[in-house]
Amino acid sequence: MASKSPAGGKKAAADTPAKPLLAADGIRKTAREMFYRDGIRAVGVDAIVNQAGVTKPSLYRSFSSKDELAAVYLRDYDAEFWGRFNAACDAHPGDPQAGLRAYLSGLSVRAVQNGYRGCGLTNAAVEYPEAGHPARVVAVEHKVELRRRLAAMAAEMGAPDPAKLGDGLLLLIEGAFVSSQLFGEGGPAARVADMADLLIDAHLGRR
């Protein structure tokens, strides 16, 4: 019997720190779904904890504020975006146009699905015009990096003005994010890959 007590004690000690982690994961998942669907400003802390089935103190033990939770959501969104973007590009080594087309072809499919609300980072930048807001900071950093990546890809394609082509591609992508929320299936977002090819070919002097 005496030998069971230490084992039981160890198990209890090991389980204790897992509880807030599980609560934090549930809060994070719930917040992501609600923030993306309804917008960050529209979703209150009470709604998040009710949906997640946790208490408000549980939320504040893991996240100091709703603003911090919003920033975490956007960092997760950023990581998911780059995971998808990089996978498309990596599938076409040495051919940046094909890699970009692969990403945009996937976007054109996602953009017409039910529940698609565009880019969570673009939406956050619109919701939070304040320059120093944590959500806007993450959104701006992401878009700056996307702009840089597109210009670098344009240079690899041999564009005479990589920055100009990169900016054109960025405008196309952002247009797809926004127009998808207006038109849905059959909207212009479905053509984003074809439009990108036309833009690239024009910049490279192809007929």
Question: What is each stretch, according to the model?
Answer:
Residues 98-99, 113-134:
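Amphipathic alpha-helical segments used for helix-helix packing
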Residues 70-77, 84:
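Alpha-helical DNA-contacting segments of helix-turn-helix folds
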Residues 66, 77-81, 92, 96, ...:
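Hydrophobic/aromatic residues within well-ordered alpha-helical segments
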Residues 1-22, 29, 204-207:
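N-terminal intrinsically disordered/low-complexity leader segments
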Residues 4, 134-141, 155-207:
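Hydrophobic/aromatic-rich alpha-helical bundle segments in the mid-to-C-terminal region
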Residues 72, 86-116, 162, 166-169:
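Hydrophobic alpha-helical connector segments
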Residues 2-3, 26, 30-68, 72:
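Helix-turn-helix
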Residues 28, 74, 78, 136-144:
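Amphipathic, non-transmembrane alpha-helical scaffold segments
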